[in-house]
Each structure stands twice: as structure tokens, then as C-alpha cells.
Amino acid sequence: DPKFAFKLGFWHEKISPIPDFEQSYLWYSVSVSSGVYKAMKLRDRVGKEIEVEKIDELQNEAKEIITKNKYFNQQNTEENI
């Protein structure tokens, strides 16, 4: 769920006792790719705290999450038909 991904990003950035900007960036990226564009500004803000090389890894990880999520959503839809 894109809104849940947004909430995870926010939690890792602002609520967690130990902020984790990498996890925040990851979940904001998933959220943006799923259509929650207000997460873009937040993702870019936490991205300033992360090394460029790590951002590339996180973007690839976000793509994997999105791809797997689309696969499972498609499987669930086909099973319900």
C-alpha cells in the first residue's frame, strides 16, 4: 500500500527513537513510485543525509519492492477472478 510505505518512511525519519535515513529514503521512494508524489520532497530531503552510492542501492531496492508488490497484487487479482 503506497500510503503505508509513506508512513514507514515518515516513521524511520521522524518517529523512530533512532532515525534511519536510509530506510526512510527507501520507503519514500516506494511511495513516490506508487503515486504518492508528496513523498518526493521528503525523500529528497532525507537523501541529502545519505551518500550518493548508497542512494543508487536504495533506488534499486525500491524497484525490487515495487516489482514484487505488483507481482503479488497481480497473483491475488487472478486468484479472485
Residue ranges of predicted features:
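Conserved structural position within tetratricopeptide repeats
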Residues: V30-S33, T67
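Terminal, low-structured helical/coil segments at or just beyond the last alpha-helical repeat
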Residues: A39-I81
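Short coil/turn and helix-start
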Residues: K14-P19, S33, K48, V52-I55
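Hydrophobic face of amphipathic alpha-helices that form TPR/SEL1-like repeat modules
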Residues: A5-K14, D44-K48
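Helix-start (N-cap) detector for alpha-helical repeat units in TPR-like alpha-solenoids
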Residues: P2-A5, Y37-M40
